[in-house]
């Protein structure tokens, strides 16, 4: 029996090796992009370290704007070149707009049933249409203006209270709570932090922790996605951790949906103050069903919470860190705020379009510290060519936005935080926080997969920064490091701690 099993296993291995040899031979007949030498079976996996975005940028420096890699049994390309990125995301959007079905996406995005991680197809189109037509419309977002203003007030009161101790404030914690509250009030109709919270501090911190954990797992380069046999051993317990987070997140989502259904039964006339979950529960399902499936609602809830919370908080923390490191930048931000807003009132959302220097600060933050170092990887649905090179079907695409912002061919002094480089040439007009026609920064992707929540994300980032710099002077108790941690987002390795000193009249903080 053992001999038979061993023989079958040997035949299986030989078939796999033969298939890979035939595929490699077919690819060699075409001209693949240049890239580093590859090891048998592993390919280039060993060349990816703890900060793979920096590793891949180094490969682009060595081999050119488009680099081919073999990651285990997966073809992959990477680029940090604006023209190549434009080719992938716009000109060949129909080829590259799908997503790879990673184990993290299967476990943590309801079988890739969401918007962000779903492969291209009818399901993705339907889910994105729901977001764009029912959740992220201008009218719907404007209906939450009052709630966002309240959260901005709570943010300042929280920091003011902490500042009275004279001790450094953990800005990662403060900014995370601000982002979380903004999102959960729109999405779920309740706060998790602050005076209006109806949940215990322990539950709130657990929710924030599990959200960060989920986002980290979604971004991790898991060997089981590239070497199927790795899943049999899973020595680091990564897939086990995914299943654990999957279970805990699903329990939370089930509780949220049940709460909303009970509330609807108790108040059948509710129609004015509808949060996103209320809207989703009111929509018809597919194929004539009366309502959307719970799993679809959960997938959309997860997308909104994870994406909007983590990316905004990470961007704000980096912007604060860079501005506090450079008092010159902070002074220019505050001069603009004093000119536009004055010192007798707080910043409103209507002021944000007039804060061009602050918008330059955010653009420069996106250049140096993009929230997503690889965006979300794309996958080709069929074979194609880029820059004259053959790209096989099902090639994984890593668009290196971190490398893009530090590409010395398009930026000078790449390690210097200099917001002035984004100032309009004409000296007037609003500074746009998007990729623009030159594709020199890419905060929200482009093409079919462009982030549908970009306008909301920009508003949340600008409002937090405007309020914090308008209301307080900031200083650091020591040196501020700029070491990052890799994941789907790219936070600081050490939370930012800074000392706040109020700069406005005391009555404005109450």
Swiss-Prot record:
Membrane topology, from the record? Single-pass membrane protein
Gene label = CYP703A2
Give the species. Arabidopsis thaliana
Q: Which reaction does it catalyse?
A: dodecanoate + reduced [NADPH--hemoprotein reductase] + O2 = 7-hydroxydodecanoate + oxidized [NADPH--hemoprotein reductase] + H2O + H(+)
Gene Ontology molecular function, alphabetical: fatty acid in-chain hydroxylase activity; heme binding; iron ion binding; oxidoreductase activity, acting on paired donors, with incorporation or reduction of molecular oxygen, NAD(P)H as one donor, and incorporation of one atom of oxygen
Q: Which InterPro entries match?
A: Cyt_P450 (IPR001128), Cyt_P450_CS (IPR017972), Cyt_P450_E_grp-I (IPR002401), Cyt_P450_sf (IPR036396)
Would you tell me the Gene Ontology cellular component terms? Answer: membrane
The knockout note for this entry states: Impaired pollen development and partial male-sterile phenotype.
What parts of the sequence cross the membrane?
2-22
**Protein known as:** Cytochrome P450 703A2
């Amino acid at each position: 029996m053992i001999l038979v099993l061993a023989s079958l296993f040997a035949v299986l291995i030989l078939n796999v090796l033969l298939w890979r040899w035939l595929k490699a031979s077919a690819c060699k007949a075409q001209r693949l992009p240049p890239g580093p030498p590859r090891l048998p079976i592993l390919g280039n996996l060993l060349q990816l370290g703890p900060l793979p975005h920096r590793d891949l940028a180094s490969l682009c420096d060595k081999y050119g704007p488009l680099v081919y890699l073999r990651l285990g049994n997966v073809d992959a390309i990477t680029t940090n070149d604006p023209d190549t990125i434009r080719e992938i995301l716009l000109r060949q959007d129909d080829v590259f707009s799908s997503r790879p079905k990673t184990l993290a996406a299967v476990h943590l995005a309801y079988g890739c049933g969401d918007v962000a991680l779903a492969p291209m197809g009818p399901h993705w189109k339907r889910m994105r249409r729901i977001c764009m037509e029912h959740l992220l419309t201008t009218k719907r977002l404007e209906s939450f203006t009052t709630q966002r203003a309240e959260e901005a007030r709570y943010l300042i009161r929280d920091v003011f209270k902490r500042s009275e101790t004279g001790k450094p404030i953990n800005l990662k914690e403060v900014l995370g709570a601000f982002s979380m509250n903004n999102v959960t009030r729109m999405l779920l109709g309740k706060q998790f932090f602050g005076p209006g919270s109806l949940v215990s501090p322990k539950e709130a911190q657990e929710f924030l922790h599990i959200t960060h954990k989920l986002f980290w797992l979604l971004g991790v380069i898991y060997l089981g996605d590239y070497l199927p046999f790795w899943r049999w051993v899973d020595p680091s317990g990564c897939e086990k951790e995914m299943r654990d987070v999957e279970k805990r997140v699903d329990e939370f989502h089930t509780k949220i949906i049940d709460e909303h259904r009970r509330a609807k039964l108790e108040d059948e006339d509710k129609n004015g103050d509808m949060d996103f979950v209320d809207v989703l529960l009111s929509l018809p399902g597919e194929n004539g069903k009366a309502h959307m499936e719970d799993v679809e609602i959960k997938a959309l809830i997860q997308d909104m919470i994870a994406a909007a919370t983590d990316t905004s908080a990470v961007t704000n923390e980096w912007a604060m860190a860079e501005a506090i490191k450079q008092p010159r930048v902070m002074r220019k931000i505050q001069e603009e705020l004093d000119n536009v807003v004055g010192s007798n009132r707080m910043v409103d959302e209507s002021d944000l379009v007039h804060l061009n220097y602050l918008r330059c600060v955010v653009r420069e933050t996106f250049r140096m510290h993009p929230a997503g170092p690889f965006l979300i990887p794309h996958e080709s649905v069929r074979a194609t060519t880029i820059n004259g090179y053959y790209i096989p079907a099902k090639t994984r695409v890593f668009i290196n936005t971190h490398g893009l912002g530090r590409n010395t061919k398009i930026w000078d002094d790449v390690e210097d935080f200099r917001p002035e480089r984004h100032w309009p040439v004409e000296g007037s007009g609003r500074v746009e926080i998007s990729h623009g026609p030159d594709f020199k920064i890419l905060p929200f992707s482009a093409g079919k997969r462009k982030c549908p929540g970009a306008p909301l994300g920009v508003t949340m980032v600008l409002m937090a920064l405007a309020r914090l710099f308008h209301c307080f002077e900031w200083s650091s108790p020591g040196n501020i490091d700029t070491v990052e941690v890799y994941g789907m987002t790219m936070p600081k390795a050490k939370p930012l701690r800074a000392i706040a000193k109020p700069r406005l009249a005391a009555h404005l903080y109450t």
